[in-house]
């Protein structure tokens, strides 16, 4: 009994330490407590013409391999600030200045099914006049049992195909 008590007292400081969240570990994400309200609506093809002197990024959330409900709401971070969110199979676009940028995709809330990654990151170097597609792919399969997210660049043809099938995401910060 004394041995167990001594072990518990010695181990207590380890359990009391603050764990860094996934979003704190990448320079792309914003504060972990930021939340968005998201609406999606089926629309036509997105405008894919960048503003003068800018690049255009189209962020796509793909839940086609997420076999559970509810689907995650995915926040998008750029260079340390949250800039928007998606839910379900949806997308939105934003302009960036030329140069190096860091992207983050992070689930707004924890997903109960499994303990996979809930944040993913990527970086790219934007050139003026160029359109970039990125896909946040959310996955969960009953036989694997772990939910996961990945963030990868997409070929422009695949990006246009997905945005023609998916809904446009609109969002605003929750208060």
Regions found by a protein language model. Give the residues of each.
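Hydrophobic h-region of N-terminal signal peptides that target proteins for export
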Residues: 8-16
